[in-house]
Amino acid sequence: MDIIFYHPTFDTQWWIEALHKAIPQARVRAWKSGDNESADYALVWHPPVEMLAGRDLKAVFALGAGVDSILSKLQAHPEMLKPSVPLFRLEDTGMGEQMQEYAVSQVLHWFRRFDDYRIQQNSSHWQPLPEYHREDFTIGILGAGVLGSKVAQSLQTWRFPLRCWSRTRKSWPGLQSFAGREELSAFLSQCRVLINLLPNTPETVGIINQQLLEKLPDGAYLLNLARGVHVVEDDLLAALDSGKVKGAMLDVFNREPLPPESPLWQHPRVTITPHVAAITRPAEAVDYISRTIAQLEKGERVCGQVDRARGY
């Protein structure tokens, strides 16, 4: 069994050694331009077209939760990957726990009005503020995949009213489910906090725009943990300036790194982190990949395969 590996920033040698330990029968090598030797599996992140084109692979593993970089290249270069080759993504591998930590900490930050107290502190102003009531602090989650379900579970512990919106209806206990474009307005109407965990697909690009933000209650909050392309940044800035949106916590952006001239950096109601809400944990990823390869070799059904038509 031959495995090729490519990631522009990961410690390649660590991955090769870890994969050797997890799959002793495999020959693992770092892919470099010009390497046209045969391979059974490819582990990749933002791979060059030539790495995958023309290969008779058993499967490709994206080394992250998203596969949009691969699918976008496939649109321009359909020869990059045969339709018959299954494409897998890392559905969790520790990312769910990280998303839970990030989302819960920020929701509580807003719920306890720490953002308002920070602004008061900046002007040396001492003034206790009225508390928010949990029953009026509905949290809405855009996207109900693996990570969305993890975030919902963690927030249920804090007894906030919860709702989700997705392509198809969910039957999660203690959570109100909305599905399809026809139910999006009703979903948004009660969301004091909107958490975005949608996949990046042609249908979701630019979905958080002026029209969507106007349907939120006045003074709502936005937490974007998915992709920067989901948000029309100028529309968000306008909503923040008008007070329609009271605060935004943004981990992802249309351009990364976020350019120094972006007005988001200096906006008093915006908090920025550099795409760190959930990162790939190498040991857990190797465990998932090795188990999945073993299942594929046995002809068993496996989880995590991407539906290329849907984009996730």
Swiss-Prot record:
Coiled coil: none annotated. The gene is ghrA. GO terms for molecular function: glyoxylate reductase (NADPH) activity; hydroxypyruvate reductase (NADH) activity; hydroxypyruvate reductase (NADPH) activity; NAD binding. This is Glyoxylate/hydroxypyruvate reductase A. It is found in: Cytoplasm. Its main location: cytoplasm. GO terms for cellular component: cytosol. It comes from Escherichia coli O81 (strain ED1a). It holds the Pfam family 2-Hacid_dh_C. Catalyzes the NADPH-dependent reduction of glyoxylate and hydroxypyruvate into glycolate and glycerate, respectively. Its EC number is 1.1.1.79, 1.1.1.81.
